[in-house]
Amino acid sequence: MKTLFIDADNSFSTTRLSQIAGYDINSVAPLIILFKPKSFREQNTIIENLENLTSKKVALIAVDTVTSLYRVELGGIEKTFALNRILNRQLAYLVKIAKESHTALLLTSQVHSVLGKEGVGRIEPVAERVLKFWSQNILRLECSEKTHLREAFLEKHLGFRSTDIHILFALTEEGVTDVER
C-alpha cells in the first residue's frame, strides 16, 4: 500500500524517514509518492489530479500543511474570499477521493494566535471554519509541561465534539511512542 504525501510546508525529511524506517528504508521509500507544491495554485492542481493516482493500492493521502501556501497568498478581503473558495473546494475534493477510494486522509494545518475576550490569546488553525466543516476527526497537538513529551487532544470524533480525551506521547528515533501517565 502506498502513501500520497503533499509536502506544502517543504518539511519532509528523508533523514527522519530513515530513522523511523530503520533497516526497512529500501522497502518503505518506494511506497511514498511525494509532491512538493511551490504555490497554492500548484497545490490545487496536484489535488485535482490525485484521483488519477488513487486506487486500491493507496492507503493514505497526507497533506502537510494544507493551509501553508493558502496563508502565504492571503491578502485583501476579495482575495481572501477567493482563496477560501479554492481551499474549500480542495478539501471537498480530498474528502470525496478518500471516501470513494476507501483511503485514509490526514491533514495538518498551520496555527496562529488570535486575541480573544479580555485580551487573552488562543491558538487556532488557519482557516479553522473550513477545516472544521470538512473534518470528521480533529486532534489538537500541544507541547506538554514536560519538554520531551507532547499531548494530543481529541476535539472532534465522527462529527461529535469531544473535550476530555487526550494522550501523552513522545517523539523518538523510532517515531511516535505512547507514554504511560
Spans of model-derived segments:
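Flexible glycine-/small-residue-rich
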Residues: 7, 36, 65, 143, ...
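Conserved acidic residues
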Residues: 30, 59, 136
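Conserved P-loop
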Residues: 1-49
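P-loop NTPase motor core
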Residues: 37-42, 48-130
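Phosphate-binding/switch region of NTP-binding enzymes
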Residues: 97-181
